Amino acid sequence: MRFVIAAELHFNELMEESRIATHSNHGLFQMAGLLSLSENLPWMKKSEKGAFFAREMIQNMLEMHFADDGLHLEHSPDYHLWMVNHLQSLKESGWLNGQESSLTDLVKSLEDSANWMCDTNHKVIPIGDTANNVLVTKRWRGYQGQINIGLRVFEKGGLLIHNSKAGDRFNQLVFSAQFHSRQHKHADHLNILYSLNSQPLLVDPGTFTYQYDIPERMYCESTRGHNTVEIDSLNYSRFRQDSFGSALTMVANSELCLITEGQVQHTRLISSTIPNNKIKSSDGVEVNINHRRIIIERPNFFLAVIDEVDSENEHEYIPWFHFHPDLQIRRDTTTRLGVVDDEGVRYCQIQCYDSESNSIESVEVRGQESPRLHGWYSKNGREVIESTAVGYPLVGNSYMWVTVFDFRMEKTGKPYLRRGTGGKYL
């Protein structure tokens, strides 16, 4: 009798639409539970109605949670892989009553996308709430262990992944220009990651336990913790009304070179000292800043990151670049930084110049605790270790500059950046 009463309570609760977390993956798990309950207890009065309700809700949520290009819209490759497993199990259950064909097409699309969610060492690409150093095989049972060579653009999802060969190793560029909701989203608009010869070079801070008010979690979510432009020591907004979907505006690719562009209009920023789950609309700082980022990659030769910001008011802009904990920064010349490992092996040189051919002075932080955490890397979602962050501070209304990562380091001249016709030509 207790079991029947408990089942009845579950039916009542799970068939109350206002109680379903339709905005997140939790809602899909709730409806999978209701469908399982309905199919396994067909003799209960509400089982038929419960199964119908669950199937309808699942169909509606699938349309909400996935882009047409096969990307899960929660900003995290880790959760993308979780969803592939979940939907595969749901499809194989036999409970969908005719919906299997549409779900089969979706699962196939998600599996194809999932094959791109690994870095050059077969670990899950750490965007959003994805931990560093998680093997893909621990998240997805269908992983075949192959790194896809070439370009994958999720135009509607807002993600670009470019994999290229480097002898028997691999290079990888990841450009994240996605903002669909608050789900597992960090303040990381136009963030980039880069691996060179299978060595992570530009890295993400990763994620941290879901205790939103602890400093490590707040740092891992922050704008300054990512490879993007921090403005006035504030975070980018993650209010849903500020979401822009995909900020990818251009992709051009040839055998030798990849060029991609993303653009975001910032209308408010948020204090980096407020936990994300406690931010109120009144905490927003109103701004009107356009940020355009152009990335030019010639694999094994160079990576150039061009940033253009435009505002009527003066701001402090700092493009931050975070390096893997195994790498160190040294000053090669007055205008060039070198990236080396503990054994002195050189990976690249870095230069940063504005559109007037002025070299921009760098700042470096590693393992900073005060006045705010900076220069840290969450290696497993529970512990942070020191890593080096390099920034290039600028103050003004509008600026354009380029940061070049030179992989050849063979008498390369200084970068030359010019624009014309209102920024239409570079």
Q: Where is each model-derived feature located?
A:
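Aromatic-lined, polymer-binding surfaces characteristic
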Residues: 1-107
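CBM-like, beta-strand-rich accessory domains located in the C-terminal region of large
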Residues: 24, 214-426
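Short, hydrophobic/aromatic alpha-helical segments in well-folded domains
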Residues: 30-33, 190, 305-306
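Secondary-structure boundary elements
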Residues: 43-46, 59-60, 96-97, 167-169, ...
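Carbohydrate-active enzyme catalytic cores, enriched for enzymes
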Residues: 67, 71-202, 207, 395-400, ...
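Short helix/strand-bridging catalytic loops that position acidic/His residues to coordinate divalent metals
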Residues: 70-72, 210-217
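Short Pro/Gly-enriched beta-strand edge/turn motifs at strand-loop
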Residues: 142-145, 171-178, 211, 271-278, ...
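Short, surface-exposed beta-strand-loop junctions and turns on beta-sheet-rich folds
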Residues: 181, 208-210, 310-313
